[in-house]
Amino acid sequence: MLELLTEKFSHALEKLTNARKITEKNINQTLREIRLALLEADVDYQVAKDFIKRIREKVVGKEVPKNLSPAEFVIKTVYEELVDILGGEKADLKKGTVLFVGLQGTGKTTTIGKIANLLKKGGHKVAVSSTDLRRPAAMLQLQRLAERVGVPYYEFEEGLGAVEIARRAVKRAKEESVDYLLLDTAGRLHVDEELMKELQEIKEVTNPSEILYVADAMQGQTALETAKTFHERLGLTGVVITKMDGDARGGLALSVKEVLGVPIKFIGVGEKIEDIEPFYPDRIAQRILGLGDIQSLVEKAQEVITEDKAQVMATKVMTGEFDLEDLREMLRMIQQMGPLDKLLSMIPGVAPQLKHLKVDEKQFKKIEAIINSMTPEERRNPKIINMSRKKRIARGSGTTVSDVNKLLKRYEEMKKMMRKLQKAGGMPAIPKMPKMPRFPSEASSFNLFLFLST
């Protein structure tokens, strides 16, 4: 996600690393590259132009704070401006009826299922319904998603029009004291008057708390132009951007708030029901600048591991008692947190510096099979594993002695790295990488990426 933009921003800002002061020459070169990066990312032309203008006004001729280098001052300014054009603060979803509008093929119906799942996990009472009479398959799809998530799907007798279905769905949601009614609407391959009139009538009878436009990140400015039409007729309150995980550019995300004046509420980051995230402008800005996203990483960890369990794991790491049973537990935890490449992108400095690493997620199964073939005593004390034991473990796991040796060697290297981390109080210095945070779980995750890389 946003890899291309991150790479180009890093390259542009790198030129200021050794600068003793900000001059017209060096800042012009940096800003020129940033401007080109934005335009290549399909950011709206006026948005890119204004962005560069604001940065120039804030850094050229200004005194650099004593606690910052010239490069840090520029990066700080760029970060603040990125947060601003991305929307400033996270925009919460207002309770009530939420209308989802947009064209066909953007993932609107699937997005409703994902958001229903997210809201339910947050402890909210959620219901869904559909007014998309033109695509019966969409109604069936939403019904199945609702069953999977475990929220009610409001279905009504045949013969009702879209507007009447919407009215009855709202009435039922109020009777059942639902926090959020997520209402799907008909889409089109392109905007037409019939669609807009129907949506306006649905808006009138439902009095929605939110009207969210669902846009495909890959469509860039095309999606933005269509969103303008919807906004003019309906008064959008927010945007959901789907397929962000496949968007290396990010032009749509960087243009929405400035062009439409409404915030991005959610982003879709994968195909699974869990692959939806609230949109945090500051976190996206950090990712664009290669500063990682520790907040999201911690939140993902908290979903799969309790604080007590994390403390036990951290204590084992610090005391050198981390064994192969703990490694197996960590592997399972990391798998539950999501794809390795996504987690890697959240660690500050790691993604751009270690992008040459290839992480094969099939390694998980192989490593776990090897560890499972060991006896409890061998897992707790790998030093007793001699050649005879290695042959038995290899046979039992369907691997080779070489695979077993590789696992044991990397395990010992990982333990050594962890001990160094604890003594140093954080990630040891790696050229051109920022110092890593002092959280054992994050350091362990980083080492696990190295452990699994091929």
Curated annotation (Swiss-Prot):
CDD domains: SRP_G
Subcellular location per the Swiss-Prot or TrEMBL entry: Cytoplasm
Assigned GO CC terms: signal recognition particle
Cystines in this chain: none
Catalytic activity reported: GTP + H2O = GDP + phosphate + H(+)
Record GO biological process: SRP-dependent cotranslational protein targeting to membrane
InterPro entries linked to this entry: AAA+_ATPase, P-loop_NTPase, Signal_recog_part_SRP54_M_sf, Signal_recog_particl_SRP54_hlx, Signal_recog_particle_SRP54_M, SRP, SRP54, SRP54_GTPase_dom
Keywords on record: Cytoplasm, GTP-binding, Hydrolase, Nucleotide-binding, Ribonucleoprotein, RNA-binding, Signal recognition particle
Binding positions for GTP per the UniProt entry: 102-109, 184-188, 242-245
Gene Ontology molecular-function annotations: 7S RNA binding; ATP hydrolysis activity; GTP binding; GTPase activity
Top EC category: hydrolase
Enzyme Commission code: 3.6.5.4
Pfam families the UniProt entry points to: SRP54, SRP54_N, SRP_SPB
SMART domains given in the database record: AAA, SRP54, SRP54_N
Role description: Involved in targeting and insertion of nascent membrane proteins into the cytoplasmic membrane. Binds to the hydrophobic signal sequence of the ribosome-nascent chain (RNC) as it emerges from the ribosomes. The SRP-RNC complex is then targeted to the cytoplasmic membrane where it interacts with the SRP receptor FtsY.
Domains as described in the record: Composed of three domains: the N-terminal N domain, which is responsible for interactions with the ribosome, the central G domain, which binds GTP, and the C-terminal M domain, which binds the RNA and the signal sequence of the RNC.
Assembly: Part of the signal recognition particle protein translocation system, which is composed of SRP and FtsY.
Similarity-based family: Belongs to the GTP-binding SRP family. SRP54 subfamily.
Name by which UniProt lists this protein: Signal recognition particle protein
Organism name: Aquifex aeolicus (strain VF5)
Lineage, uppermost ranks: Bacteria, Pseudomonadati, Aquificota, Aquificia, Aquificales
